[in-house]
Amino acid sequence: MTIPKMKLTTLSIFALLFTIGCQQNGEKTAAKTTETTTKTTATTKKNILFFGNSLTAGYGLDDASTAGFVGLTQQKIDSLNLPYRCINAGLSGETTAGGNSRIEWVIEQQPVDIFVLELGGNDALRGLKAEESKKNLQGILDKVRTKYPSVKIILSGMEAPRNMGKTYTTAFHNVYLTLAKRNNIALIPFVLEGVGGIAELNQKDGIHPTAEGNKIIAETIWKVLSSLL
């Protein structure tokens, strides 16, 4: 049977439009699937909140987001393809009292799965009472756990300058040991281990670590953090 040319042309156009329509639907489906996958990946990442002072903030570094220990920790996590996002909530000059006042607002901004608390250094430099520092740190821990009962917590220990006297330095050292035991949380005995007091690993002020110093701090933190991931 011979099909008229007009009918043949009509059938050809219909077939072409049908094919294009199928391709477009396939592309839309693929695009939607990719978009959904991307959104799912983003929403399934857990948050690690670093809450501290200028050490956490990366004071004095050219680019704290990459050279600070929080940024370096994120790079380590990404290299291992782990589903975690590091959030830097460091504030230069922060004391434990300031942190205790600020924490509620910070933890309202996003869910917290792992909480790394690094505060106390400014208390020690100012010679504030160790008992008050302990009270403030406990307040922070209580607020975080009340908001997120299943949160995993790391307490970053700090040491007071030796010129504060043995009585004070011992009392300050024991603050972190006591809190870690009381709250059953992970402890980094001294977050500046291998960095504090070493001139070439600190900036001119002798207090804030250089980029190289931050690399060492990141490794110190990783030894404890990695077991919680």
Give residue spans per PLM region.
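Serine-esterase "nucleophile elbow" of acetyl-processing enzymes
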Residues: 28-92, 102-110
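Short histidine/acidic/glycine/proline-rich micro-motifs that form metal-
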Residues: 55-62, 90-94, 122-124, 159-165
